[in-house]
Amino acid sequence: MSRYRGPRVKIIRRPGVSPGLTSKTLKSKSNYIDRSTSNKKVSQYRVRLEEKQKLRFHYGLTERQLLKYVRIARKAKGSTGQVLLQLLEMRLDNTIFRLGMAPTIPGARQLVNHGHISMNNNIIDIPSYNREPGDIITIRNKLESRSMISKNINLFQKLKMPSHLSFDLTGLQGSVNQMVNREWVNLKINELLVVEYYSRQV
């Protein structure tokens, strides 16, 4: 299954709030049905599927990519669900978004793909590149790169930055201070349901 490229607001309404997918503010719809107040019974498979889709759409992953991350998380020490979130949060594209350098994760991915980002003085064009404590993320010394990202920073750095990251406004560079903790994940998700969804595939 390929990465979703359709209307983002439509997707957000379906699985729930996904702050990394769009910077738009949703308007409530009068015909929206809240499952918590509906009498219709929802299967456990449906619940797990929707949590999985929420996670996949938020981080902009293909089905194959998410399954790969789940398999890696299962082999690691600790809670599989929390390790999975940690792997996704420490991706380069998500880190750029959380630093306020891009309005959305898709926007951050585009910055990386177009070569606007350097990491530890090396140009990185792989959005899935995994971050580690001590990594320094900078903007390439090009007028186009610095102008574009400076504009994003002015607009989106008002949002609360997670404690595992920091940003130097003077030098226009971000730092990864430590591995992300569960409470710093900016997504309402039950990661255990995602792990359960993939239980027969890993």
From Swiss-Prot:
GO (cellular component) term, any one: small ribosomal subunit
Family: Belongs to the universal ribosomal protein uS4 family.
Source taxonomy: Eukaryota, Viridiplantae, Streptophyta, Embryophyta, Bryophyta
Organism: Takakia lepidozioides
Locations listed in the record: Plastid, Chloroplast
Function per UniProt: One of the primary rRNA binding proteins, it binds directly to 16S rRNA where it nucleates assembly of the body of the 30S subunit.
Subunit record text: Part of the 30S ribosomal subunit. Contacts protein S5. The interaction surface between S4 and S5 is involved in control of translational fidelity.
Ranges annotated as biased composition (Polar residues): 20-37
Start and end residues of each stretch annotated as Disordered: 13-37
UniProtKB keywords: Chloroplast, Plastid, Ribonucleoprotein, Ribosomal protein, RNA-binding, rRNA-binding
Keyword match rRNA-binding: yes
Keyword Plastid recorded: yes
Limits of the S4 RNA-binding domain: 90-153
GO molecular function, one term: structural constituent of ribosome
Gene: rps4
Protein name: Small ribosomal subunit protein uS4c
GO biological process, one term: ribosomal small subunit biogenesis
